From Swiss-Prot:
PROSITE patterns reported for this sequence: CLP_PROTEASE_SER
Signal peptide: none
Reactions catalysed according to its record: Hydrolysis of proteins to small peptides in the presence of ATP and magnesium. alpha-casein is the usual test substrate. In the absence of ATP, only oligopeptides shorter than five residues are hydrolyzed (such as succinyl-Leu-Tyr-|-NHMec, and Leu-Tyr-Leu-|-Tyr-Trp, in which cleavage of the -Tyr-|-Leu- and -Tyr-|-Trp bonds also occurs)
GO MF annotations, alphabetized: ATP-dependent peptidase activity; ATPase binding; serine-type endopeptidase activity
Localization per Swiss-Prot or TrEMBL: Cytoplasm
Full protein name: ATP-dependent Clp protease proteolytic subunit 1
One GO BP annotation of this record: protein quality control for misfolded or incompletely synthesized proteins
InterPro entries xref list: ClpP, ClpP/crotonase-like_dom_sf, ClpP/TepA, ClpP_Ser_AS
Chief localization: cytoplasm
Task performed by this protein: Cleaves peptides in various proteins in a process that requires ATP hydrolysis. Has a chymotrypsin-like activity. Plays a major role in the degradation of misfolded proteins.
Gene transcribed to yield this protein: clpP1
Amino acid sequence: MHNLIPTVIENTGNYERVFDIYSRLLRERIIFLSGEINDPKADTVIAQLLFLESEDSSKDIYLYLNSPGGSITAGLAIYDTMQYIKPDVRTICIGQAASMGAFLLAGGAKGKRESLTYSRIMIHQPWGGISGQASDINIQANEILRLKKLIIDIMSNQIGVDKEKLALDMERDYFMTSSDALKYGLIDSILVRE
């Protein structure tokens, strides 16, 4: 199956320029993060965030999310960059923001975390496949517990939900509609056509 990226032709008087759709949207300060969050995708998103900050640190950046989640370390790298740069990062869920996708959605600037009407959001505890010697399994289990606490601490601070409640809700897959996510504090508004 081919993954075709649409192009846009921009006509500016004397010449035409052809852009892939993502490059054209980047000019409007829009970044798309779709699919599994992994190191290569994180590198691309981080580079785009840093580029847009260097272009104009006073204008918001729009991060559209449609992700089932993915790597904790890749997600934390994106989150850290979102918090580090000067522009506010508006997060918008389109489709779904699950696991690390929900974490990044909640990591947007307060008051600027949004979702489309029929998107779904899901939070849960970190998980990982562990194998090896008993001592290695113990080391990995301790690291997963450390990351779980870190994610809960950060999300609790971002969305204003008590750490104990958040930890309990994250014990299993916790699915939310946009309305549920709004009540929960994961998002600040639901986008509808005006």
